[in-house]
């Protein structure tokens, strides 16, 4: 009954520098591959919920091949494109390596799952797999996120403004620095009540806060921090956009 969880080590990406991000990305797959002998076995298939890095599917490939069982890879972050949103890789050889490794790992899955039809087409083009081997299963959010939730205290705090609300993880992929600059431009053009409310956390939070301070945007943006999932509707209900 239930799920048995086996954890593997990883090198934390302290400071989110290029070096620590790289070490974080490569460490978990290596540690996980070395820990496969801890698994009791008897499995019918291997399923990978493949976010970042793409290398996280390598232990799954290794286990499936050893035990001759099918491997399905649910692709949520497309690599190496997602990598480039975090690390500005300019070297053409390194980009070729990232592309080649990513395509090779995707090809080694017996079946791929994409989040959307455009991603499905992209994976088919890159792997040469037939359409029947690349399914589409869209992501969704739990029903409670769609139910408005009024919080009088929050509504009083953020009333009288046009609230642009973002909830989630702050990473370079979200380009929230661009959003902040756009809000400032809009306010300068006359949208004086426009306010950016950022709920969450992530590797870009410190740089975003530094940018807000540099641009004197203290009254333009609020960094609320992380909240429990069930609290999120209280913030999205505040959103005018």
Regions flagged by a language model, labelled:
Residues 110, 236-241:
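Acidic donor-binding loop of glycosyltransferase active sites
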Residues 124-125, 132, 140-156, 175:
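Acidic anion/phosphate-binding donor-loop and adjacent secondary structure
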Residues 206-233:
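Nucleotide-activated donor-binding/catalytic signature segment of Leloir-type glycosyltransferases, i.e.
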Residues 22-32, 45-76, 80-82:
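An aromatic- and histidine-rich active-site surface loop
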Residues 118, 137-140, 226:
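Carbohydrate-associated surface elements
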Residues 155-174, 179-184, 197:
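Conserved donor-binding/catalytic core segment of Leloir-type glycosyltransferases
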């Amino acid at each position: 009954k239930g799920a048995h969880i086996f954890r593997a080590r990883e090198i934390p990406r302290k400071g989110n520098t290029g070096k620590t991000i790289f070490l974080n990305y490569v460490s978990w797959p290596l540690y996980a591959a070395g820990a496969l002998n801890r698994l009791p076995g008897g499995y019918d298939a291997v399923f990978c919920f493949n976010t970042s890095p793409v290398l996280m599917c390598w232990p799954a490939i290794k286990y499936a091949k050893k035990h001759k069982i099918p491997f399905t890879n649910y692709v949520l972050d497309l690599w190496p494109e997602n990598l480039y949103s975090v690390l500005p890789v300019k070297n053409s050889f390194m980009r070729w390596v990232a592309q080649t490794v990513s395509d090779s790992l995707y090809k080694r899955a017996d079946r791929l799952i994409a989040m959307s039809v455009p991603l499905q087409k992209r994976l088919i083009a890159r792997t040469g797999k037939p359409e029947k081997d690349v399914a589409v299963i869209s992501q969704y959010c739990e029903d409670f996120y769609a139910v408005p939730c009024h919080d009088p205290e929050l509504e009083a705090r953020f009333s009288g403004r046009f609230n642009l609300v973002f909830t989630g993880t702050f990473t370079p992929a979200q380009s929230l620095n661009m959003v902040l600059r756009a809000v400032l431009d809009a306010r300068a053009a006359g949208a004086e009540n426009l306010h950016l409310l950022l709920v969450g956390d992530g590797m870009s939070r410190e740089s975003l806060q530094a940018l807000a301070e540099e641009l004197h945007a203290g009254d333009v943006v609020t960094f609320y921090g992380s909240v429990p999932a069930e609290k999120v509707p209280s913030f999205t209900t505040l959103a005018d956009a």
